[in-house]
Protein backbone atom coordinates (compact mmCIF):
# COMPACT_ATOMS: atom_id res chain seq x y z
CA UNK A 1 0.00 0.00 0.00
CA UNK A 2 1.14 3.54 -0.68
CA UNK A 3 1.91 4.97 2.75
CA UNK A 4 1.31 8.53 1.51
CA UNK A 5 -2.39 7.66 1.47
CA UNK A 6 -2.27 7.60 5.25
CA UNK A 7 -0.63 11.02 5.58
CA UNK A 8 -3.74 12.62 7.10
CA UNK A 9 -3.73 10.09 9.91
CA UNK A 10 -0.69 11.52 11.70
CA UNK A 11 -2.69 12.20 14.86
CA UNK A 12 -3.69 8.55 15.29
CA UNK A 13 -1.81 6.05 17.43
CA UNK A 14 0.51 3.72 15.52
CA UNK A 15 -1.78 0.74 16.18
CA UNK A 16 -4.71 2.52 14.51
CA UNK A 17 -2.53 3.49 11.55
CA UNK A 18 -1.54 -0.15 11.12
CA UNK A 19 -5.19 -1.21 11.31
CA UNK A 20 -6.15 1.37 8.67
CA UNK A 21 -3.29 0.24 6.41
CA UNK A 22 -4.47 -3.37 6.71
CA UNK A 23 -8.04 -2.34 5.86
CA UNK A 24 -6.87 -0.43 2.78
CA UNK A 25 -4.78 -3.43 1.70
CA UNK A 26 -7.82 -5.72 2.02
CA UNK A 27 -9.96 -3.32 -0.02
CA UNK A 28 -7.32 -3.16 -2.74
CA UNK A 29 -7.13 -6.97 -2.91
CA UNK A 30 -10.93 -7.23 -3.03
CA UNK A 31 -11.12 -4.66 -5.83
CA UNK A 32 -8.36 -6.40 -7.80
CA UNK A 33 -10.18 -9.73 -7.56
CA UNK A 34 -13.46 -8.09 -8.52
CA UNK A 35 -11.85 -6.53 -11.60
CA UNK A 36 -10.22 -9.84 -12.58
CA UNK A 37 -13.50 -11.75 -12.23
CA UNK A 38 -15.35 -9.12 -14.23
CA UNK A 39 -12.73 -9.31 -16.98
CA UNK A 40 -12.90 -13.10 -17.16
CA UNK A 41 -16.70 -13.19 -17.19
CA UNK A 42 -17.06 -10.47 -19.82
CA UNK A 43 -14.41 -11.78 -22.20
CA UNK A 44 -15.48 -15.41 -21.83
CA UNK A 45 -19.13 -14.56 -22.45
CA UNK A 46 -18.30 -12.39 -25.47
CA UNK A 47 -15.70 -14.64 -27.08
CA UNK A 48 -16.42 -18.30 -26.32
CA UNK A 49 -19.45 -19.68 -28.14
CA UNK A 50 -19.02 -23.43 -28.04
CA UNK A 51 -17.35 -26.08 -25.93
CA UNK A 52 -16.15 -28.35 -28.73
CA UNK A 53 -12.67 -28.82 -27.30
CA UNK A 54 -10.58 -28.15 -24.21
CA UNK A 55 -8.59 -25.33 -25.79
CA UNK A 56 -9.68 -22.13 -27.47
CA UNK A 57 -9.53 -21.95 -31.24
CA UNK A 58 -7.52 -19.13 -32.84
CA UNK A 59 -10.54 -16.88 -33.30
CA UNK A 60 -11.63 -17.27 -29.67
CA UNK A 61 -8.08 -16.74 -28.42
CA UNK A 62 -7.71 -13.58 -30.49
CA UNK A 63 -11.06 -12.29 -29.26
CA UNK A 64 -10.16 -12.94 -25.61
CA UNK A 65 -6.80 -11.20 -26.04
CA UNK A 66 -8.40 -8.11 -27.65
CA UNK A 67 -11.17 -8.06 -25.04
CA UNK A 68 -8.69 -8.24 -22.15
CA UNK A 69 -6.51 -5.50 -23.64
CA UNK A 70 -9.52 -3.22 -24.12
CA UNK A 71 -10.79 -3.91 -20.62
CA UNK A 72 -7.41 -3.21 -19.01
CA UNK A 73 -6.83 -0.03 -21.04
CA UNK A 74 -10.29 1.19 -20.09
CA UNK A 75 -9.70 0.39 -16.41
CA UNK A 76 -6.36 2.20 -16.47
CA UNK A 77 -7.92 5.26 -18.10
CA UNK A 78 -10.76 5.35 -15.59
CA UNK A 79 -8.23 5.03 -12.75
CA UNK A 80 -6.12 7.86 -14.16
CA UNK A 81 -9.17 10.09 -14.57
CA UNK A 82 -10.31 9.31 -11.04
CA UNK A 83 -6.84 10.22 -9.72
CA UNK A 84 -6.94 13.49 -11.70
CA UNK A 85 -10.32 14.36 -10.22
CA UNK A 86 -9.17 13.49 -6.69
CA UNK A 87 -6.05 15.58 -7.12
CA UNK A 88 -8.17 18.52 -8.27
CA UNK A 89 -10.42 18.20 -5.23
CA UNK A 90 -7.48 17.90 -2.82
CA UNK A 91 -5.69 20.95 -4.24
CA UNK A 92 -7.31 24.24 -3.20
CA UNK A 93 -7.51 26.89 -5.96
From Swiss-Prot:
The reply on keyword Protein transport is yes
The superkingdom of the source organism is Eukaryota
Locus of motif Twin CX3C motif? 43-67
**Membrane topology designation:** Peripheral membrane protein
Question: Which Gene Ontology BP terms does the record give?
Answer: mitochondrion organization; protein transport
Disulfide linkage: 43-67, 47-63
InterPro entries noted in UniProt: Mito_inner_translocase_sub (IPR050673), Tim10-like (IPR004217), Tim10-like_dom_sf (IPR035427)
> Pfam families from the entry?
zf-Tim10_DDP (PF02953)
Q: Span of the secretion signal?
A: none
Cellular localization per UniProt: Mitochondrion inner membrane
GO terms of molecular function: metal ion binding
Q: Do the record's keywords include Electron transport?
A: no
UniProtKB keywords: Chaperone, Disulfide bond, Membrane, Metal-binding, Mitochondrion, Mitochondrion inner membrane, Protein transport, Translocation, Transport, Zinc
Record's GO cellular component, any one? mitochondrial inner membrane
What the protein does? Answer: Mitochondrial intermembrane chaperone that participates in the import and insertion of multi-pass transmembrane proteins into the mitochondrial inner membrane. May also be required for the transfer of beta-barrel precursors from the TOM complex to the sorting and assembly machinery (SAM complex) of the outer membrane. Acts as a chaperone-like protein that protects the hydrophobic precursors from aggregation and guide them through the mitochondrial intermembrane space.
Q: How does it assemble?
A: Heterohexamer; composed of 3 copies of TIM9 and 3 copies of TIM10, named soluble 70 kDa complex. The complex associates with the TIM22 component of the TIM22 complex. Interacts with multi-pass transmembrane proteins in transit.
- What does the sequence similarity comment in the record state about its family? Belongs to the small Tim family.
Give the domain note. The twin CX3C motif contains 4 conserved Cys residues that form 2 disulfide bonds in the mitochondrial intermembrane space. However, during the transit of TIM9 from cytoplasm into mitochondrion, the Cys residues probably coordinate zinc, thereby preventing folding and allowing its transfer across mitochondrial outer membrane.
| Protein name as catalogued | Mitochondrial import inner membrane translocase subunit Tim9
Q: Which organism is it from?
A: Oryza sativa subsp. japonica (Rice)
